[in-house]
Amino acid sequence: MIDIEIAFIQALQDQAAWLLILMQFFSFLGQPEFYLLIIPAFYWCRDPRLGLRLGLLMGISGGLNEALKVVFHLPRPYWVSPDVRAFGSYPSFGLPSSHAQGAVTFWGLIAAHVRRWWFWISVVAIILLIGISRIFLAVHFPADVIVGFAVGAGTLLLFLALEGPVGRRIARLPLSGQVFVALAGSLALALVSVSALATLGDWQVPASWAAGAIERSGQPIAPLSLRDAATASGLLFGFAAGAAVAWPKRGGMCAVGEWSVRLLRYIFGILVTGAIWFGFGLLIPEDPGLTAFALLYIQAAAAGAWVSFGAPAAFAYLNLADRS
């Protein structure tokens, strides 16, 4: 099966080499950095409720993806085959594709919100192109992408089914209870990845995978690291806890106003988000130990809380937004 998938990737790269820049563009549309730029734009400047839903869903989806990668612990194409060209490098396992999964959850939720047939067609095209881009870049097998689509669809459907009843129950809790639920949920999400790693026992990454990755991309791999799991769970906690403080009776976020004001709001908010992210990043050691895990969690939680609560409060103070 792997040989067939490698042959498919090789043929795709050979027959459509001119598509490289386009494929890199669509791959970026599935990057975590893209979501970190777009979700605040919805939350601060367009539709706070949709931004809130997107932030919560992407945090849950990201944490689930990290756990599933460890459960399956399968390689990426360029780790195992010299016949493909590595147009990207990633240290984590390959299946399921986080880009494919994230594309379905992110764009699918927006499409469910917009409810226009033409938008659904556009979303399906974007999702498929993101998946194809990952195969073209040789960072995923076709099976990785297909499973990512399936997991993303399942996650999205569960979220749509449960967000109403679960959200109403959480909304009836006092603020302390809501923050506790956010903390417990994020730690449970991290625990899933920790438990998945524990099930591997003394399994080790094959030396040939590590050597192949370095040979073909120049970058080392660290698929047994839980750094991404810590980041996903921290973002979920910070974003959810901040929203509990800001939403809805305690002020919320008012996204109306002139577009020039919204632009200033976004630029200021994103600059502070970047300062928080990269400032904390200077404190995080490269080793995969508990200290690094805790600092990654705190870094992500601080960024998430700034987006959902700190920034709206700052906007109101600076007269860039009104309390709603």
Please place each PLM-identified region on the residue numbering.
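The first (N-terminal) embedded transmembrane alpha-helix
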Residues: 26-36
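Short, strongly hydrophobic alpha-helical membrane anchors
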Residues: 1-22
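Interfacial loop-to-transmembrane junctions
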Residues: 257-261, 288-297
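Membrane-interface capping segments at transmembrane-helix boundaries
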Residues: 166, 248-250, 312-324
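Small-residue-rich transmembrane alpha-helices that serve as helix-helix interface/gating elements
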Residues: 293-308
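The feature marks cytosolic C-terminal regulatory regions of anion transporters and related permeases
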Residues: 53-77
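Long, hydrophobic alpha-helical transmembrane bundles and adjoining juxtamembrane helices/loops
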Residues: 14-17, 41, 238, 301, ...
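Membrane-embedded catalytic cores of phosphoryl/pyrophosphoryl-handling enzymes
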Residues: 23, 38-39, 44-45, 52, ...
